[in-house]
Structures are given as C-alpha cells and as structure tokens.
Regions:
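Structured secondary-structure scaffolds
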Residues: 2-40, 46-47, 99-103, 152-286
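Short, composition-biased local secondary-structure segments
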Residues: 2-7, 50, 73, 77-80
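Short Gly/charged-rich anion-binding patches and loops
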Residues: 31, 55, 77, 106-107, ...
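Surface-exposed helix-capping loop/turn segments at secondary-structure junctions
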Residues: 39-42, 85-90, 116-119, 275-281
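Short, charge-patterned binding micro-sites
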Residues: 49-55
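Surface-exposed, active-site-proximal loop segments in enzymatic domains
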Residues: 56-62
Length: 286
C-alpha cells in the first residue's frame, strides 16, 4: 500500500437542490481520488452536506416544513446525483448526524481546556450576510450588499466569541513556512493580505436562530454554522467518539478541495480553531 491520502470536498448546503458547482467540485475530487488509488495510495475521500444555520432554517420556514425535512429531501438528491455520476467517495457526512455533533462538542471542549480564554462571551454589531452566514467588514459593504452582491443586514447580538485575533501571527508564520498551504498562489496572496490587516475575534454562536447544535453551557445559543461545518473533516473520522483509529491514520487531510468563495473559512478560521485545540493542520487547501 502506498501513502495515505485524505481528500475532502466542501460540504454542501441543503437549502436548495445540488447544482453544477457542487457537481464540478465532486467530479474534480473524484478524479484526484481515483488517480491516487491507481498509484497505489491508501485514499479516503469524504463529501457531505452542511445542514444547520439560518439559511436552512429560513428556507424550511418558507416551504412550511421543519429544517430536518428539507435536509432529508435535499440529501436524497445529493445521494442520487453522486450515484448517477459514479462518484467514488468513501464516506458521506451529514452535520445533523450524532457522530458529527460529538465531534463539534469535543473540539469546543479541547479549545476551552487548552486555551480557556480563547472562547468568551461578548456583544457584537455588524453587517451580517445570510447567504455567507458570516459578518462582513464595513469596508466590504456598499449600498446594503457585500462585494459579491449578497444583501447584508445590520445585526447586534450578544454571543460567544473565539479569540481569532490571537492567531494573526501564528497563521502568517504558517503560511510563510508552508507556501503551498493554499493553492494556487493567487489565493494564498489573498489570504495573507486578509490576515495581515489584523484579525478580529470571531462570533461563534447565534441566539437568533434555533436550528443547530446547542453551545455547551449556553442552551439559548447554537454553534456558529461555520465552526460546526468545518469540524466535519475530523468528526467523519471519529473525532470525539473514543475510537480514533481512523482519525490517527488519515488526519491531517492532504487536500481540502473548496470553492474560491470559502477559502477564507478553510485557510484562516479552520487552522486557527485547530491551533487552539492543539490539533494538526490540513496540508493543503485547493
């Protein structure tokens, strides 16, 4: 058996049916996975669905159904599409699965245990983009929209925060030491420029929505959808389950294959969470 090779796609939102962008990403990942298998490598190929958050909650309400009903219906479409395209994934993770919830809670527990002041309670006001499920910096908002044209709304919430600002220097050092961490180089340059501006602490809970994983110790808050979603890459390997054989074998991921619109989440937020928890970082975000 050759080298281990763990490849992941981004997990896809279930607020609507799968589209050509989802298909493109999974086909590219499938080609890479098949190639590595033919080379004799020990490949693990993960894909899945992101089923929590405001976007899904609102889409379900618009249809007059529960979020899990909408999720189940759309997930069935994903399974049908990947079967039709003969996508050779080894696992399919849903963020509504119990194994995923366990992994998310374990990540938070490790952060709080290792770096107790990395998570704290505070108030935040800013321009919130429902489409991206994140706050948008003031200089990226024009006439009520972000730079990609998505509408934003002014939001004030008392939430739990992650001390992302602490990781500005460690992240920049990691990029310099690992110049292929983000590929292509143009995307790495964008990430470096973003981080060099200085990172602000990140809101990691929401009290305005109910559809998600409850934050430990704060029953009125659900965990921020991106902290929830990103953890799929380790929860699918059994992180937090007590059986870490697959995690120990395949982690860190060799390649996170993602769309250009979510590079920041994978190249900034995700490695910062992992640094805080004392876990190895993925080798590459493509």
């Amino acid at each position: 058996m050759g080298k281990k090779f763990y490849i992941t796609t981004a997990i896809h939102y279930v607020n609507d049916l799968p589209h050509i962008g989802h298909m493109y990403e999974n086909v590219v990942a499938d080609v890479i996975a098949r190639h590595r298998r033919r080379m004799g490598d020990d490949v693990w190929f993960l894909t899945g669905t992101d089923e929590h958050g405001q976007k899904i909650e609102r889409s379900a309400a618009k249809e007059g159904v529960e979020p899990i009903e909408l999720a189940n219906r759309v997930v069935a479409n994903h399974h049908e599409l990947w079967k039709t395209l003969n996508i050779s994934h080894d696992d399919f993770i849903r963020t509504t699965e119990a194994r995923h919830r366990v992994g998310v809670l374990e990540l938070i527990r490790r952060i709080q245990e290792r770096m107790p002041d990395d998570i704290y309670f505070g108030e935040h006001s800013g321009w919130y983009c429902q489409s991206e499920e994140t706050f948008i910096p003031e200089n990226q908002v024009k006439e009520g929209k972000d730079l990609d044209g998505h509408p934003v709304e002014w939001t004030t919430e008392a939430n739990l925060f992650f001390k992302l600002s602490r990781y500005t220097k460690p992240l920049l050092e990691h990029y310099r030491a690992n110049p292929s961490f983000v590929y292509p180089p143009t995307r790495l340059n964008e990430v470096v420029a973003f981080v060099e501006q200085g990172l602000k602490d990140l809101s990691i809970s929401r009290s305005s929505i109910k559809w998600g994983i409850s934050f430990p110790g704060y029953p009125d808050h659900v965990i921020y959808v991106w902290m929830d979603a990103l953890t799929n890459y380790i929860s699918a390997l059994g992180f937090g389950s007590g059986d870490h054989k697959k995690l120990d074998h395949y982690w860190p991921a060799d390649m996170h294959l993602v769309g250009k619109d979510i590079v920041r989440f994978h190249a900034v937020y995700w490695p910062a969470f992992l640094m805080s928890a004392g876990l190895p970082l993925p080798k590459q975000v493509v």
